[in-house]
Amino acid sequence: MHLGDIITFEVWEYLTSLCQVEAVSGNCDMPDVRRRLKPKKFLEMGGFKIAMTHGNGGVSEALKAMKQEYEDKVDVAMFGHTHVPCNMQQGKTLFFNPGSLKNARIGHNSYGILHLDGKPSAEVIEI
């Protein structure tokens, strides 16, 4: 799963050559990537409803917008944009931002792992 800012179509091609990729577009993506990817995506995996979006705004604004749009409507709401990890349960919804592989805004660069066995949970892995 990729939460936006793939940047170029060449990166998209490389990622999809490795495995199946579910992704949304981000604000830094080139037009050819934006034409192929939507800003929001909804999936059902492991019996759970998952919303994916890149997001916008600062940390508190992004989380507030995610809560308003998705709280108690999906099991997992995933977002990017802020480059700051978030892993919190609010109501029945897990809000998850894995941070950023590059250019972390706070702390270390990171990626995330989403677990869908039993109740959804997530990990932020610092690199």
Locate predicted features.
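Active-site neighborhood of phospho(di)ester-bond hydrolases with catalytic His/Asp-centered motifs
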Residues: 1-5, 22-27, 52-54, 75-81, ...
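Mid-chain, well-packed structural core segment of small domains
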Residues: 47-79
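Hydrophobic anchor at the start of a short beta-strand
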Residues: 21, 50, 122
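Core catalytic region of metal-dependent phosphoesterases/phosphodiesterases
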Residues: 1-45
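Ligand-binding grooves and catalytic loops that recognize ribose/phosphate and carbohydrate rings
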Residues: 32-48, 63-69, 92, 97, ...
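Binuclear metal-dependent phosphoesterase catalytic core
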Residues: 45-46, 72-74, 89, 96-127
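Residue-level detector of beta-strand structural context in well-folded domains
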Residues: 40-41, 85-86, 112
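Active-site environment of divalent metal-dependent phosphoester hydrolases
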Residues: 7-11, 28-34, 57-62, 78-89, ...
